């Protein structure tokens, strides 16, 4: 059984999520201890348990320690089950997108349909529009297709969002994403939920003003939803090049003007573009597991603590070589084979 110290590296939920994904894919059981030991509320929290539950259902796994506050978990997977429907409610504003990242690599070609309720646009995780505009589009470039249906948005703290992910299929193989290529267009989605529509317009316009200096077409849509459980706003952007995509997002909050939200996302996007990387900071972390499974190389905008932690966990499950050139927290090249 693979032994994992949950306090290693960034010491958060990423260690658990990566371990769950690779355990289900490889069939290797693991024991993780010191879960989130250095966090203010140590141990498993509800949204972590839903990641465990989802992967348990997918693989018919045996578990021990899967309860709120537990600092140790044993996870023994069996064969991945296909042709199933799974309902997950991560509660209030628990991150829907972190659940998607955990389960998606394990359900390729398995005919699994997952309905996830919780927070679609919450702090400390990619927004659902980033997932749609960037994550899924880059996966398409490496041979993976998925259908994502955003039914309701959920913001912190009320949540109430709902997403369905299904038809995850493909024939992924080794990939090389070493440059963005010529920038062709910037796409985006500026949204509001249960707030005035002009907020989405102001976010869009302020982002557009900064991005116009890049000299490429800009297509930002607005998504205005009234009657949602939670109130909130945000914007996600995708700079689409001939070979890859760079993304960024920003969320509104009480007291934060809509213009600041749009400017913030645009500045993050420009900062990522200026690194000359092939993928942004979010994808630098998320792409590593796919490169580890299928072989791949890419240039990430920043070598984050999440990426570094991911590397060490991946090496416990897979007999691969990870060649990384670059120092935290700067641009880096990853080659995994």
Swiss-Prot record:
It is found in: Cytoplasm. Gene3D superfamilies: RNA 3'-terminal phosphate cyclase domain (3.65.10.20), RNA 3'-terminal phosphate cyclase, insert domain (3.30.360.20). Keywords: ATP-binding, Cytoplasm, Ligase, Nucleotide-binding. ATP binds at residues 101, 282-285. It holds the Pfam family RTC. It is an enzyme of class 6 (ligase). The active site is at 306 (tele-amp-histidine intermediate). GO terms for biological process: RNA processing. GO terms for cellular component: cytoplasm. It comes from the Archaea. GO terms for molecular function: ATP binding; RNA-3'-phosphate cyclase activity. It catalyses: a 3'-end 3'-phospho-ribonucleotide-RNA + ATP = a 3'-end 2',3'-cyclophospho-ribonucleotide-RNA + AMP + diphosphate. Its EC number is 6.5.1.4. Its main location: cytoplasm. InterPro entries: RNA3'-term_phos_cycl_insert (IPR013791), RNA3'_phos_cyclase_dom (IPR023797), RNA3'_phos_cyclase_dom_sf (IPR037136), RNA3'_term_phos_cyc (IPR000228), RNA3'_term_phos_cyc_type_1 (IPR017770), RNA3'_term_phos_cycl-like_CS (IPR020719), RNA3'P_cycl/enolpyr_Trfase_a/b (IPR013792), RPTC_insert (IPR036553). PROSITE patterns: RTC (PS01287). PANTHER family: RNA 3' TERMINAL PHOSPHATE CYCLASE (PTHR11096), RNA 3'-TERMINAL PHOSPHATE CYCLASE (PTHR11096:SF0). Belongs to the RNA 3'-terminal cyclase family. Type 1 subfamily. Catalyzes the conversion of 3'-phosphate to a 2',3'-cyclic phosphodiester at the end of RNA. The mechanism of action of the enzyme occurs in 3 steps: (A) adenylation of the enzyme by ATP; (B) transfer of adenylate to an RNA-N3'P to produce RNA-N3'PP5'A; (C) and attack of the adjacent 2'-hydroxyl on the 3'-phosphorus in the diester linkage to produce the cyclic end product. The biological role of this enzyme is unknown but it is likely to function in some aspects of cellular RNA processing. This is RNA 3'-terminal phosphate cyclase. The gene is rtcA.
